């Protein structure tokens, strides 16, 4: 969040102790606010009020020489705005991306693209593929870069909330792989069995790219209801029972870290490609998890 570059550096300085192989940089979609003009009239204003993903990625890469993976979204971006982001990243020699549809706007009940933007990540992949070939969104051509973008995509061990079934989810994941995705990062989960089952289902469907588990430590009692509602995932009964014994958030955080450590150890013992720790902007939490 927009707390200044020194706060960013403090966070990364803490993370460097663990020799991270890469750092993902999230992107926040633009949002709309409505200004009351009186007489029943409202003016809709589109706002971006956080430092740009490109700026954060460049700051980390240039200071620390750590691979950064900026997230590229359909959500809240037109095709031209996406092209501007790709041009800036290309100039900075930042070539690793995570390509996502992104979330609905806060006021939306269904996902709506921004202007001529995309409904699905696979459409965004096509724009990136064309960019790698030297083709702009308007069809004009540019010099092909010597360092093309490579990218991963998202996947959902407990099914995307909008997918009718897991088979449909796997069908579209395979399409994204065929379109050029080199790996996938999962939605967060708290039950490793669901990850292992999903990986086996993916293999059976002919999906053979690395599937990186996304892990988010549980840390507050309020997350007992917030996590299932926000991320559309289940919390295992054993985790819920332990959390309900907690008298405050400090105790809940300890339970969450212990659960996370157990998860990570089991995943690593099964030879996962890597671990993606989600929401680790609080630099002390990785210290506990380590």
Language model: regions and residue ranges:
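Conserved, mostly hydrophobic/aromatic
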Residues: 23, 89, 176, 180, ...
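Catalytic domains of carbohydrate-active enzymes, especially glycoside hydrolases
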Residues: 10-26, 178
């Amino acid at each position: 969040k927009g707390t200044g570059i020194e706060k960013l550096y403090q966070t990364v300085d803490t993370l460097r102790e663990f020799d991270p192989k890469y750092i993902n940089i999230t992107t926040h979609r633009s949002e709309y606010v409505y200004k009351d003009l009186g007489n029943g009239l409202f003016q809709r204003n589109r706002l971006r009020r956080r430092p740009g993903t490109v700026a954060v990625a460049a700051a980390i890469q240039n200071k620390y020489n750590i691979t950064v993976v900026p997230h590229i979204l359909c959500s809240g971006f037109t095709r031209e705005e996406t092209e501007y982001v790709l041009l800036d990243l290309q100039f900075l020699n930042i070539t690793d991306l995570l390509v996502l549809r992104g979330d609905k706007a806060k006021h939306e009940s269904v996902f709506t693209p921004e202007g001529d933007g995309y409904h699905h990540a696979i459409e965004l992949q096509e724009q990136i593929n064309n960019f790698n070939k030297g083709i702009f969104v308007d069809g004009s051509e540019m010099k092909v870069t010597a360092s093309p973008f490579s990218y991963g995509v998202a996947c959902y061990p407990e099914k995307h909330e909008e997918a009718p079934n897991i088979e449909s989810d796997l069908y579209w994941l395979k399409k994204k792989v065929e379109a050029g995705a080199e790996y996938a990062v999962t939605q967060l989960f708290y039950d490793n069995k669901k990850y292992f089952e999903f990986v086996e289902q993916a293999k059976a469907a002919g999906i053979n790219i690395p599937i990186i588990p996304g892990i988010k430590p549980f840390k507050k009692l309020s997350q007992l209801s917030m996590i299932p509602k926000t991320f559309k995932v289940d919390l295992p009964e054993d985790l819920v029972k332990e959390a309900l014994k907690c008298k405050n958030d400090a105790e809940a955080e300890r339970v969450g870290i212990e659960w996370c450590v157990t998860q990570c150890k089991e995943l690593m013992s099964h030879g996962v490609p890597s671990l993606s720790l989600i929401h680790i902007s609080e630099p002390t939490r990785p210290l506990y998890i380590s």
